[in-house]
Structures are given as C-alpha cells and as structure tokens.
C-alpha cells in the first residue's frame, strides 16, 4: 500500500513537461506493442519490433516517415491502430485526457486545468474545458469535410467501401499533418495534376497549421461583422497580435515558397519540367505547403534541384504555427527571432510589431526552442552518418530535418535504414514532437515565476 501511495505521490508531482514527455513515450510503447502482434501484419510479411516501434512513433508524432509500405504491410486492424495513433497525436495527449474526463462527466481539477493551460502555453486558466471542446469540434469538422472532398475522387476510383476508407484515413492524416496514406509507395504522386486531391490536401494542411487560436479569432471577428459591430475592412486590424503574425508568416511562406520552387524547377525535367504550366504551379504550391510538416508528396523529393532542396530544408525547420497539429520551430518563433534581430540592428531596446511589445520571456523561449531543434538536428545527423556511412550526406540531413520537424518527407533513405539508423530516427521524431512544446512551455512559465529583481553580477565577454 505504501508503494502505491509513493507512486501516486510521484505521479501527482509531475509537471506539465514531464507529463507530456512520459505520456508520449507511454502511448508510443503501447502502440508499438499492438502493431507487433501477429494479427496486425498482412500475410506474407514480417514485422520486427523495431519496425513496429518506428511505425508507432511516426504515427503518434504525426511525422510520416515509414520503413514499410502502409498500404500492403498492415492488415485492417493494423491500419486502424495507426489511424487512432495519428488522431491521438493530432489531438494531443492533454486534450485526450480532458476528453476522457468530460465523457465520464468527471470534474477537471484545478491542477489538471493548470496542465491544460501550460500545455497550450496560454496566459489565463479560464475556459479550459470550452477550449478543449472547441479543439475537438474544429478538428473533427475539418476532417469530415476533407473526407467528403476526397471521396469525390476516391470512391469512383476504388469503390464505395475502399474509397470511403481511403478518404477518411487521408483526411485525418492530412489534417493531423501525419503524411501517412494507404495509396502505396508513391504517396499522392498519381494525383499531381488533380485539383480536387491537391487543393483538399493543401486546405487541410494550412488550416491545421494555422492553429486553433487563429481560427477562433477570425471567427469571432466574422461574427462581429455579421452583427454590424465591425466593418469588413477592419477584420485584420482587430485580430490579436498572435493571429496577425501567424497569418502574415503563413502567407509569406506559402506564396514565397511556391514562387521559388516554380522558379528553381520549372525547367527541370526530373521534377516538374514536363508538366503543363498549371500543373507546375499546383505541384509547386503542394511542395511549398507539404514541406511545412505534412509529409505527403506529388513529386519525389530526390528529383528536385539543389536550390529547392535547400529551400525545403528551411521550410521544414520552420513548420506550422502554435496550437495546431504541425511541427517545426513554428512560424511565431521565426517571426520573434527576426523581429528581435531587426530591433537589435536598429538599436532598439524593445521588440515591437503592430504597435505592440513582445515580452522578453517569449524571446527567450524562441531562442531555446530554436537552439534545441538545431542541436538535435546536428547531433542526430552525425549519429546517422556514423550508423550509415554509405548514405549520401544530403539524404541524411534531409531525413533528420524531416524527423526533427515531424514532416515525413524523405529522399528515399527511410526504407534503407538499418536497425541503428531506425532507432536514431525514432529518437529524433520523439524529441522533435515533444521538444519544442515542452521546452517552450517550461521556459515561458519558469520565466514568469522568477522575481523581476533577481540578478547576479554582470561581466563582459566578447561576441563575434
């Protein structure tokens, strides 16, 4: 009994960062063990423990790198388990726990509300349950609409049952930014010229990448316009600073990435050079969007030019926005770093944008998250190079960048990974999924609790 009480007390003392870290690890292990069971593997195939753990990790971390072909290797039971893991990874463990409490009609304690607050990196505790409910409504609603759009193409092609199953799986995978599909080894390549599949995928990826807070902010302003309380032309001006930064960064990255990919590869016959002008632009748009943590592709990654390769590395690292399903260091992190750089070059003490000042704690959080991701990227790239000396360095860097940013794109290296390489990528995906969220939350909360007048003596050092 004493041991049970000690265990309970230890679990009760866990902070948000520890809950997220242990929670993801626990679900990954459980999912891996389930996928390792014989009934999950299709006849004629064998699933090693490493491949089962790799698949569970890539699913719960909504990455999309796969060592086996999902469409043929797994049975229906295995595919359902993968889909559930993707949905859990997209919803988030904290939201999932809240769902269980709500469904059981149990009251969420003050401590658990604090966990929800810190996991979403929010300043106030009010409305936490409403927040989780809104997340679920938005997520399942968007996935449902996406499934209907995909069904328009998949049902005529594959039949009612299989087409409907493919539609639901692809919609969930696209919205959760997992990039796992049931269409075979070539992802969505057969639909490179199909507007329905392309724009449905792009729409789901961008919507989830914006983050739920931005959705609600825009919806709130639209309601005010409908009620006649706000002119249409002043919607953007009345948005929260967070929403303004996210929308501006997303627009710049999507449009800028599309234009640059088109310019770099429009004459490349290996990638998009042989397509019609409209298909070239559509393929460029898809590549620009999917590199920001989606993982689907309509053109094989190794076919793009070196310039597009470098651009994709940058887009993968940036990723999506907070409070969404995307990975990466996040658009707001990059914006804060760039604004901080601008302020320092101009000799300003404060970081300002849209007539607002950004807190120092958020600047520190942005630095920590970026530093952590770059550190993991460098270390894991070296380890994978050591484990697979025969692999080209550009493929290794692309693989690790994709893993740490939970993107899921590969230049063909994933199926060729040896056992050591697979475990390196598993660890990278795990660190990439829990790292930015955990460290960003921990640093911000800790900074807010520190006394403002607590300082040590200063001493000069040389920089640059």
Predicted regions and their residues:
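Membrane-proximal intracellular helices of multi-pass ion channels
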Residues: 1-464
